[in-house]
A protein has these predicted regions:
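Acidic, PIN/NYN-like endoribonuclease modules and their adjacent C-terminal/linker elements
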Residues: 1-17, 152-185
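Short amphipathic alpha-helical segments
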Residues: 145-153
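Alpha-helix capping/helix-boundary segments
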Residues: 28, 69, 150-151, 168-169
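Histidine- and aromatic-rich ligand-binding microenvironments
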Residues: 24-27, 65-66, 143-146, 166, ...
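PIN-domain endoribonuclease scaffold, especially VapC-family toxins
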Residues: 50-64, 68-140
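Short, well-structured N-terminal submotif of metal-dependent ribonuclease cores
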Residues: 1-69, 75-92
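Residues that cap or flank secondary-structure elements
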Residues: 44, 142-143
């Protein structure tokens, strides 16, 4: 295993990723595939993310995705659809109520189509996360949410480079990199 690096996204250049496996965190998938810039990123950041994605494809990197990331993507997209539906219709529906709305299927089908699109370009890994084998889970879970614990463990085990804009990864691993990270400072 080579040296692990932290690369600030603004300093990313083609060839920075030395690992063969790359993981795009949920927030990156949203920026790359979900319409409307819901994360309100600057055009400069969006262009960098596009560059990273294109470089990975051109360099033949194996882009993997695990089910917790797909789940986070669906849940976030669902929340955005619900919020937009409520705002546009002057409603205050909850998730279960929204599912019963006549237009729900349109939103749901759209979200599933986006997931199908990026899933067809990546390798969906059937990752068996073993919670009991995480020796420093108490420390990591002080800074990471549980899904991020799963993602970081996967990246470490797969020797993968994680592309994320979630500062929790930087804060948790900056002094003791277990895997390479491309993120914001």
């Amino acid at each position: 295993m080579g040296q692990k690096t932290f690369t600030e996204i603004n300093n990313y250049r083609s060839g920075v990723i030395q690992e063969n496996v790359v993981i795009f965190d949920t927030n990156i998938l949203i920026d790359l595939f979900y319409p409307g810039n819901i994360n309100r990123r600057s055009q400069q950041i969006l262009n960098k993310l596009d560059d990273i994605y294109i470089d990975c494809l051109q360099q033949g990197k194996e882009i993997k995705i695990i089910i917790p990331i797909v789940s986070e993507f669906y849940n976030l997209a669902f929340k955005v659809a619900l919020d937009n539906y409520n705002r546009n219709n002057g409603l205050r529906l909850k998730r279960k109520q929204f599912r019963k709305e006549p237009n729900f299927n349109i939103y749901n089908t759209g979200i599933i189509s986006i997931i199908d699109n990026f899933s067809s370009q990546f390798k969906i890994e059937q990752y068996k996360f073993n919670y009991n084998n995480i020796v420093d889970k108490e420390t990591k879970l002080l800074k990471l949410d549980f899904t991020d614990l799963i993602i970081s463990t996967f990246c470490e085990e797969e020797n993968a480079c994680l592309v994320t804009l979630d500062k929790d990864f930087r804060k948790t691993f900056r002094r003791n990199l277990k895997f390479s990270i491309i993120s914001n400072w």
